[in-house]
Amino acid sequence: MNGPLLRGPVLRLTEAGWFRRLVTGRLGRPVVARFVAGEHLDDAVRAAKALDGQKISTILDHLGENVTAPEHAVEAVGAYVRALDRIRVEPFLDLTVSVKLTQLGLDFSHELCVANMERVLEAAAEIGTLVMIDMESSAYVDRTLRVFRELRERHDRVGVALQTCLRRTGRDVDELPDGSVIRIVKGAYLEPPEVAFATRREVDTTFAQLTATLLARGHVVHVATHDPALLDGTVSFVERRAIPWTRVEFQMLYGIRRDLQNRLANEGYPVRVYVPYGTEWYPYLTRRMAERPANMWFFASNLVRFGR
């Protein structure tokens, strides 16, 4: 079945109470560990060290989104500052961080979110670390890009993700500040057909086209996909145009297509893995299941294996 068409049924399944109890219970935890480094920063750093041994860099993501009170956003800022402090004392690891703006208070106000992001960016600037902004559902795109553009006026080391499943993303690319750092992703949220493409072919074609456009216009591009055809297409485009590899990076998710991660790293390409950690891992995990049928099959088959 087509990936975008399958996403809805899978996400509805993960909303069922019995499914959540299964995943978060004793049987599910060993499988969750494949996709989430753990609930603590130490777990994420341990995963980063293992990846470093494979010539793979790391982007840390302290899981959480749509906080329900401003003080929870402040707590999230504290978690990121602690992560950045940890990066300071791990100088041999190539670590960056990624944040969701709804975790930093975007649902409450633009001003609160910007103030919280300023604290994170100031801590990151002290150690020269890049901070990436995750893109959330289509309802947040305008607000997310507004925050990004405002912060970009004062900070160089901040970037944002764009989703090729959304019909609007080509226009958003046209309005980016010069020399932006962009993570290009397919997108994992369930979206209505009026705002998102309905077929995998459309999403993949847009991914390839926008990756080429971003690179041709001088942006730094983090190509975030596990699709070998799109990865190979990027390599061909970069080499044909003689684009320096300092402007390109391949990014993948922790626990997914580790064979591909290792192959690219061993071939000398820059690879960075998105390492999530924290207690709020369930929404993240369910999106991973929905975006790739293979992930759902892996989870189900391993539940059976661990349950024996």
Where are these regions (language model features)?
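Positively charged, amphipathic and often flexible ligand-engagement surfaces
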Residues: 1-308
